[in-house]
Design a protein with these regions (language model features):
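Cys/His-rich short segments
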Residues: 46-91
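Extended interfacial segments that mediate partner engagement and assembly in macromolecular machines
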Residues: 25, 75-141
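Conserved phosphate/pyrophosphate-binding and hydrolysis machinery centered on Walker-type P-loop NTPases
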Residues: 18, 37, 50, 62, ...
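Short Cys/His-rich Zn2+-coordinating modules
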Residues: 7-12, 35-58
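Long C-terminal interaction/binding lobes of large macromolecular proteins
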Residues: 101, 128-196
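Extended, structured, electrostatic nucleic-acid-contact surfaces
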Residues: 1-18
Length: 196
């Protein structure tokens, strides 16, 4: 039996979220039906707030809600070491480890010829503009084909400038996703990084 129209619309909206299939979307929709009006209003307000208040940091590309558009990490941390990641959620994974004291740079993607994503389609230019005074760039893209290609491309651009370029190391199997790695694995990968 098909879903009634309002439920079908809500399920269709939930399936637009990354990693949410129809069954999970239906569970979310049915869960909302069980909630009180005030709980649903709270959810609506939280969704509105996140869209209106959260922006990209103008320095690193991470999410921020600061009025000056600069995240707390960029304001307060050691700027001589930059850890380059694919997307903002990778920063959260590294921050759980609590061992990295430098700053980050979010590429907002990786080089992927199959998906027609080249170096100009991700924020490599923003990274290059931040290199004054930097001693090391740690490339922490996922250990898959696209992540490796991106790491090598970045290394070729930065190494001639006399800046040390390293890659997160063992502990992350090839093809894995940083966001899902546990804290110990990420800590080891950071600590045992290798020079490119």
């Amino acid at each position: 039996m098909p879903y009634i129209e309002p439920l079908a619309k809500l399920i269709a909206e939930f399936t637009k979220f990354e990693g949410v299939g129809e069954k999970t979307a239906a569970r979310y929709a049915y869960s909302i039906l069980k909630r009180s009006d005030s709980e649903v209003d709270d959810l609506i307000n939280a969704l509105r707030d996140v869209k209106q208040k959260v922006k990209f940091c103008k320095i690193c590309g991470n999410y921020t809600d600061d009025v000056d558009d600069v995240c707390e990490i960029c304001r307060t941390r050691d700027k001589s070491v930059i850890c380059v990641v694919k997307e903002p959620k990778d920063i959260q994974a590294f921050e759980k480890v609590k061992s990295f004291k430098g700053v980050y740079h979010v590429l907002h993607g990786v080089i992927s010829p199959i998906e027609h994503v080249g170096p100009d389609d991700i924020d490599i230019k923003g990274l290059l503009k931040r290199l004054d005074g930097v001693k090391e760039v740690i490339v922490a893209t996922n250990p898959d084909v696209e992540g490796e290609a991106t790491a090598l491309y970045i290394a070729r651009l930065i190494k001639p400038l006399g800046i040390k370029v390293t890659r997160i190391a063992r502990g992350l199997p090839e093809g894995s996703v940083i966001e899902y790695a546990d804290e110990m694995t990420l800590s080891t990968a950071l600590r045992t990084r290798v020079e490119l």
